[in-house]
Amino acid sequence: MTQNTFMEQALINAFKGLDLGEVPVGCVIVNQDNKIISQSYNKVIADNDPTAHAEINAIRQACVSLKSERLIDCSIYVTLEPCIMCAAAISKSKLKRLYYGADDMNFGSINGGFNFFQTKNCNHVPEIYDSISKIQCENLINDFFKGKRP
């Protein structure tokens, strides 16, 4: 499977969230054998939980699946640049690689004005790859917010 294949699955998850009225962000975590071990989408409204972002949900599932708080040889694919909370969870879980689609210039933790991974308190920095399926990811999030804020 390729980076684009995993991002396509993350996009499918984002659309599931969109169907429920959530901000459409989807996520997939794969192990070292490139097998999907968890996937999710934003469930903030559904769970009445401001921390129920796609990345947090998928990290929790992956940790349970692997019976470990560390995801050392795993990669995470997410349709939108992670926020600071999600970046901290990515760091704490020791994910090896982060792939994301669209930049988030408002709340992003990498290109959005504050790079969490460059702070002195960040104890693990994943390999970071941006702009995976960028156009599709940007269109999805931009169309959602155009509908909310005309």
Segments (PLM) and residue ranges:
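Zinc-dependent deaminase
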Residues: M1-L20, I36, E69, P82-P150
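Short loop/turn microsegments at loop-to-beta-strand junctions
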Residues: T2, V23-G26, C74
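Small-residue (primarily alanine) positions within well-ordered alpha-helices
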Residues: A10, A14-G17, C27, S38, ...
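Short beta-strand scaffold segments in enzyme catalytic cores
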Residues: V25-N34
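Short beta->alpha transition motifs characteristic of CBS
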Residues: I37-I45
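Residues that line or immediately flank small-molecule/substrate-binding pockets and catalytic motifs
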Residues: V44, V78, A102
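Helix-adjacent hinge/juxtasegments
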Residues: N48-T51, I56, R60-S91
